[in-house]
A protein has these predicted regions:
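Carboxylate/His-rich catalytic cores and anion/metal-binding grooves
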Residues: 294-302
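Conserved short alpha-helical segments that host acidic/polar catalytic motifs at enzyme active sites
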Residues: 9-221, 226-284, 289
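Short, positively charged and aromatic/hydrophobic N-terminal segments
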Residues: 2, 6-9
Length: 302
């Protein structure tokens, strides 16, 4: 009866995508999530909201088959004007929650270093958790529980960013729109795209370009916005302290991505050049391991 699940997490990367459209958003959502497949190989999910039918959700294991194959059926059967989804290297998400805020879906990216303390505090207030895996609470459900400690989504999201020791970016899907919040120190990116009939929020800046969107802007550290098909509203202004994860450029990021206006491919090329200057050798051949190693190798060779 006194069992409290313990977290022993290492860092798990992932990516998310959210879309709001005046028409059906599922096509954009499906391919927007698929463009994040390089960020995870274990689980993926998508959740949509339709004014006519309400919420719908699907989660699949993608260890033995890619996202596009596993979610082909859902891409044809699910419908909605608002949707979020993710590629996750750890927990099953997005999850659906019903609380005093109403029904909402949430997906997160990050690492909660003080999860044990937060779980103990919330359980001590009489709350329980449903999503368990290997004896551990689903981190995304934990974030939802933190948000539910406050009276509204804005205060709840700010509270989650405040109490989490680590990194936390999220998308929250509600009937009124999608909340997008970037980590308080900007460790992981969140970028907004726009097209004629809607908006999107994405981890990767290139994920929506083939879907007809153009760059709107990147969220700043700790910034929170809410958007629907017609507008984007800033709820929490960005902070000034930026500590974006440099490993995005070195390894995680797709070659055509850019973060804070800096191209991943250019950064890797320049890193390769810097390594060559440091080593002061004249090799006969330089080989790069795809994908992240190619630009490093070209920079090193040149």
């Amino acid at each position: 009866l006194n069992f409290v699940p313990k977290f022993t997490y290492t860092i798990f990367m992932g990516g998310f995508f959210g879309a709001a459209s005046q028409t059906d958003c599922v096509f954009d959502l499906f391919f927007g999530i698929d463009y994040h497949s390089h960020l995870g190989t274990r689980r993926a999910g998508m959740a949509v909201y339709s004014p006519e039918t309400g919420f719908d959700k699907a989660i699949h294991n993608i260890e033995n088959a890619p996202f596009r194959t596993k979610f082909t059926t859902e891409s044809q059967s699910m419908h909605g004007t608002l949707g979020i989804g993710c590629i996750s290297d750890y927990e099953a998400q997005p999850i659906l929650v019903r609380s005093h805020h109403g029904t909402f879906a949430i997906t997160t990216i990050g690492k909660i270093n003080n999860a044990n303390e937060i779980v103990e505090d919330i359980i001590g207030r009489g709350t329980h958790f449903f999503e368990m895996q290997n004896g551990e609470v689903n981190p995304t459900e934990l974030v939802a529980a933190i948000i539910d400690q406050k009276e509204n989504f804005i205060d709840g999201i700010r509270y989650a960013q405040e109490v989490v020791n680590g990194s936390l970016s999220m998308l929250v899907l509600t009937p009124r729109g999608i909340y997008a919040a970037r980590d308080k120190l900007g460790r992981t990116p969140v970028v907004l795209g726009q097209k004629e009939d809607g908006y999107c929020a994405s981890f990767e800046s290139f994920a929506y370009l083939n879907l007809g969107y153009h760059d709107l802007r990147e969220l700043g550290p700790g910034e929170v916005v809410v958007f629907d098909a017609d507008h984007v509203q800033t709820l929490v202004a960005p902070g000034k302290k930026m500590k974006i994860c440099t490993f995005l450029w070195v390894y995680y990021g797709y070659p055509s991505s850019s973060y804070e206006g800096i191209s991943v491919e250019s950064m890797r090329y320049n890193c390769g050049r810097a390594l060559a200057r440091r080593d002061n050798v004249h090799p006969d051949i330089v080989a790069g391991v795809p994908d992240s190693g190619i630009a490093h190798a070209i920079g090193y060779a040149n």
